[in-house]
């Protein structure tokens, strides 16, 4: 089979319905818009969320929550990610060199998903209890900075 021999699967491509192209087409005159009314006019129709004058749902429901401006964003790393690095010491400097984080100001949290096979020393912002237990079990050290 060659590229010029490829064909679409039967029924996978539908022809575009051409409206307003004469009465014989079956889609002429009103062009599937019906007779008169707001929706038949050019530019007609109502805005999104309009419910005919009834107070719309988005105004009936109360406002809720907010986004805290003081929220800290952490880059999440799992033990399996640290294992792939295959290094004895893991800190911000190493992660920047390995292009895992963009700069040393980024906050990093280590989670316990996966496992490690050798002792590693970790100097990062946050470490979960399960990750800390796994690291210390193999003789590694965890330092939260």
From Swiss-Prot:
Residues of the signal peptide: none
Region annotation (Disordered) ranges: 1-51
Function: Binds to the 23S rRNA.
GO molecular function: rRNA binding; structural constituent of ribosome
Gene that produces this protein: rplO
GO cellular component: large ribosomal subunit
Biased composition (Basic and acidic residues): 1-18
Keyword line: Ribonucleoprotein, Ribosomal protein, RNA-binding, rRNA-binding
Pfam families reported in the protein's UniProt record: Ribosomal_L27A
HAMAP family associated with the record: Ribosomal_uL15
Top-level taxon: Bacteria
Protein name from the UniProt record: Large ribosomal subunit protein uL15
Subunit comment: Part of the 50S ribosomal subunit.
Organism of provenance: Mesoplasma florum (strain ATCC 33453 / NBRC 100688 / NCTC 11704 / L1) (Acholeplasma florum)
InterPro entries listed in its UniProt record: Ribosomal_uL15 (IPR030878), Ribosomal_uL15/eL18 (IPR021131), Ribosomal_uL15/eL18_sf (IPR036227), Ribosomal_uL15_bac-type (IPR005749), Ribosomal_uL15_CS (IPR001196)
Lineage, highest ranks first: Bacteria, Bacillati, Mycoplasmatota, Mollicutes, Entomoplasmatales
GO biological process: translation
Keyword Oxidoreductase listed: no
Protein family according to the UniProt entry: Belongs to the universal ribosomal protein uL15 family.
Positions with biased composition (Gly residues): 42-51
Family annotation (PROSITE patterns): RIBOSOMAL_L15
